[in-house]
Every structure is written in structure tokens, then in C-alpha cells.
């Protein structure tokens, strides 16, 4: 029998509806492990695993098809892009309550020669912390982080476990706080109510509804590009210049990567000023909406 998009329907032991006929690989319908919905996941790793499992089943051993989360990677010129689990769009389409964080980091300690940028995105449940998926892009180190997050999903770890994960560390290989740890910290800040974020695709609507963008980068950073119509107050001057901000206005705060804007968000909230953090900050916005920036 066939099912989704003509894929072969099999049971949990890879048996078709015909006696003694089994099917595995790209042609079979599997369960998307997170949503438990039917899926066609055409990847070599699950297909090879299925071959081993069906051989065990035919030999009389108990092996079950547990489905797949769909972990994939591709090289595009000098960049690597990888994903695991559900995208933000897929999670929302499945009806899951969804939150998202982006972080910018380096593949290893930034002060050690040869460090390159990478961007990571985490999709998760905002209260339980269940991890739905992750994506990453960068020159180096993306495979390592997505493999870790794929393992976390398979092992049913949550965002609250990510800061506690331990990795081998020396400056040529990583950072004392790995980008995966930082993803966990950022996600926990949302889950615990310490931060509220605005996604890049929500910014224009927020500004149209009266919010003001506050850029806390320093002048040297702003020489590499600026948000249009943003209020500029460097973070190290913000506490002394809080009186310049209107307590009746909602502020969306950005820096280069999101860390300083989180600090600024906390400062504003403690001063009784409404504030949210632009998730991914300038670094992400420059990647997805460069036409809306000045002097890029």
C-alpha cells in the first residue's frame, strides 16, 4: 500500500501489507518523531539504520521503527548549513506552541586565530522547554552544534539542560561557553520571563504600531550599518541617559548579536520602561533584510 506522496506504507517492523515483503529507505513513509505525523525523510543515515533494523527483524530480533527527526547538512561554497527536527514554520503548521531564539557566535574562542562566525536558531516550547528543532549556518563548526542538538532532541533533553552540557574545550576547538550553551541560556531567559523578544519579520509591524528601535551598539559598529530611524545610545552610556527615553513608549532593543541588547532590555525594565529584545539583533537583520538598513 502507498501513502503520503506515494511512499510505501510499512508497520513498525518495516513490513508492508504483503506477507514477507519489507521496505526501507527513501521510499517508505516514516513517523516524524516530534509530531508523530507521516513523513518522507530521504536521508542516507536513517535509510542505512533501517536496513540494519529490518535485517534484525527478519532474523527474529525485536527492532522497531522509531521514526526520524530529519537531520541534514549541505555545503554551499564556503558556508555550511544544517538543520535538525522542525523548522519554525513546520512547528507552527503542526499546531505546536512555539518560541524561537537566535544567537551569533564563533566556531571557537574569538581571541584565537582563525575563528569564524556562525548563526544558530533554536525552536522550542516556551514553557516546557521541549526542543522542536534547530538550524545553523557558518563557515566552520555548524555540524558539531547541530549534531549536539539532534542528540539532545533524540535524548529528550530540554532547553534547561543545554547550559549544563559539557564539551571538550581549548581555545582552538571551542569556547568556555559553547554556542549550544548560549542557546540554552537565551531560551531559558524567555521561558523564565527575564526577556521578551521580537523576530526580524515582526519588527516592521512593531515599529508601525508605535514602538521605537533603540540601538545600543557603539559608534564604530554603526559605521558598518545602521537601522533607519533608530535611537542610538551605546550600552555603556545607557544608565546615565535613561531620562532621554519616554516611559510611555515601547522600545525594541538591538545590539550586534543580542547579548548587550538583553542587558539593555533588563536595564530598561528595571527603570519601568517597556522593552523587548530584537532576536538575533543587527547581525541577523543584516543577513535577512539588508535593504532596510542604511550604510551597509
Where do the model's predicted regions map?
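A short alpha-helix-loop-beta-strand transition element characteristic
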Residues: 2-5, 61-71, 97-101
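FAD-site-proximal beta/loop scaffold in flavoenzymes
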Residues: 1-53, 152
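Active-site-proximal substrate-binding core of FAD-dependent oxidoreductases
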Residues: 38-42, 57-84, 164-170
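Flexible, glycine-rich terminal cap/loop adjacent to redox cofactors
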Residues: 78-84, 92-194
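Short, hydrophobic alpha-helical segments
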Residues: 55-62, 153, 191
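Active-site flanking residues adjacent to catalytic metal/cofactor-binding acidic residues
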Residues: 25, 214-216
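Rhodanese-like catalytic fold shared by cysteine-dependent sulfurtransferases
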Residues: 160-171, 175-212, 219-252, 256-296
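Short glycine-enriched, charge-decorated loop/helix-capping segments at active-site entrances
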Residues: 37-42, 137-138, 228-229
Amino acid at each position: 500500500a502507498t501513502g503520503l506522496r506515494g511512499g510505501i506504507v510499512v508497520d513498525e517492523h518495516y513490513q508492508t501489507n504483503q506477507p514477507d515483503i519489507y521496505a526501507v529507505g527513501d521510499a517508505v513513509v516514516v513517523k516524524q518523531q516530534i509530531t508523530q505525523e507521516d513523513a518522507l525523510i530521504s536521508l542516507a543515515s536513517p535509510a542505512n539504520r533501517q536496513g540494519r533494523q529490518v535485517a534484525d527483524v527478519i532474523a527474529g530480533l525485536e527492532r522497531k521503527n522509531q521514526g526520524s527527526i530529519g537531520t541534514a547538512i549541505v555545503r554551499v561554497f564556503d558556508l555550511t548549513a544544517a538543520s535538525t527536527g522542525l523548522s519554525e514554520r513546520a512547528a507552527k503548521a503542526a499546531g505546536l506552541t512555539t518560541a524561537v531564539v537566535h544567537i551569533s557566535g564563533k566556531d571557537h574562542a574569538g581571541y584565537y586565530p582563525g575563528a569564524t562566525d556562525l548563526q544558530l536558531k533554536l525552536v522550542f516550547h516556551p514553557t516546557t522547554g521541549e526542543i522542536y528543532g534547530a538550524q545553523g549556518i557558518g563557515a566552520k563548526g555548524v555540524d558539531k552544534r547541530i549534531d549536539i542538538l539532534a542528540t539532545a532532541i533524540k535524548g529528550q533533553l530540554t532547553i534547561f539542560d543545554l547550559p549544563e552540557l559539557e564539551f571538550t574545550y581549548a581555545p582552538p576547538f571551542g569556547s568556555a561557553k559553547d554556542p549550544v550553551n548560549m542557546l540554552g541560556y537565551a531560551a531559558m531567559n524567555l521561558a523564565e520571563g527575564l526577556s521578551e523578544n521580537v523576530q526580524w519579520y515582526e519588527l516592521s509591524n512593531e515599529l508601525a504600531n508605535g514602538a521605537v528601535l533603540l540601538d545600543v551598539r557603539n559608534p564604530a559598529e554603526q559605521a558598518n550599518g545602521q537601522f533607519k530611524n533608530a535611537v542610538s545610545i551605546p550600552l555603556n552610556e545607557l544608565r546615565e541617559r535613561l531620562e532621554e527615553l519616554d516611559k510611555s513608549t515601547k522600545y525594541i532593543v538591538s545590539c550586534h548579536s543580542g547579548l548587550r541588547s538583553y542587558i539593555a532590555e533588563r536595564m530598561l525594565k528595571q527603570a519601568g520602561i517597556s522593552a523587548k529584545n530584537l532576536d538575533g539583533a543587527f547581525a541577523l537583520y543584516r543577513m535577512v533584510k539588508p535593504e532596510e538598513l542604511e550604510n551597509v
